Regions:
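N-terminal leader/linker segments that precede catalytic domains of diphosphate-processing enzymes
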Residues: 1-230
Length: 230
């Protein structure tokens, strides 16, 4: 018997394993004055070119151990702690702001990595407890670049610095949350933003969501990971 799967054109494309990643939703204001910190991915990148997104990216080696300048992370499971650090680091790299709290001016802050030096130079601690876990999303299996992304929320009152564009995100600024902005987002971005707004307003219900695709359809499941207390 011949194996039809070996015939030309019948080979299955291997599914790419998703990389752990993180993204940070930063909001300021209320009601009609509610704004979101976001930017547009450059047109030359391979993943989501020209799309408006929150700052974020894949986990780096420096995110896998506690930073010397962090606080409030002792209660977090290791994977969520890594993702929270990545969200803070990527936000600094992509939009130029730090999320944290003032450090004790009399306590020395040793720094070994660029992100640690950034916090140290500004006299800040990276507050992992200033983040709220919003949800998780997994890129569809047909994509050749896949991410297992944890989304977090923080408030503008925890932001130090002024947002600026970078090589990774263009047109970075505070955007009023209106229909024009929402129309420019992917469905997963709109979903996580709506969840973040509900969490901030205290109107969110249900468990932490898992946004994924199965059989070419969008699915919303329950994320079983531990929550970051608000």
């Amino acid at each position: 018997m011949n194996d039809l799967s070996l015939l030309p054109g019948k080979a299955h494309k291997p599914v790419v394993r998703p990389r752990d990643a993180a993204s940070l939703i930063v909001l300021r204001g209320h009601g009609r004055d509610l704004e979101l910190l976001a930017g547009r991915r450059p047109g030359h990148v391979k993943f989501m070119p020209g799309v408006y997104v929150f700052p974020g990216g894949a986990i780096d080696p420096e995110d896998r151990r506690p930073w010397r300048v962090e606080s409030g992370g002792a209660h977090l499971p290791p994977r969520l702690a890594r993702c929270a650090r990545a969200a803070l680091r990527e936000t600094w790299e992509e939009v130029g702001v730090l999320i944290g709290r003032p450090a004790d001016p009399n306590a020395p802050l040793p720094a070994a990595t660029p992100i640690e030096r950034a916090y140290c130079e500004h006299g800040l601690l990276a507050g992992l407890d200033l983040l709220t876990y919003v949800g998780r999303a997994i890129t569809p299996s047909y994509s050749n670049r896949r991410f297992n992304t944890r989304f977090f929320l923080s408030d503008a009152r925890n932001v130090f610095g002024e947002p600026v564009s970078s090589e990774e995100l263009e047109d970075v600024r505070w955007y009023p949350i209106g229909q024009h902005l929402l129309d420019s987002f992917r469905d997963v971005t709109r979903f996580m933003l709506a969840r973040a707004i509900a969490l901030r307003d205290g109107t969110a219900t249900g468990d932490v969501p898992l946004f994924y695709w199965a059989k070419n359809a969008r699915r919303i499941g329950v994320c079983r990971e531990a929550l970051i207390p608000r």
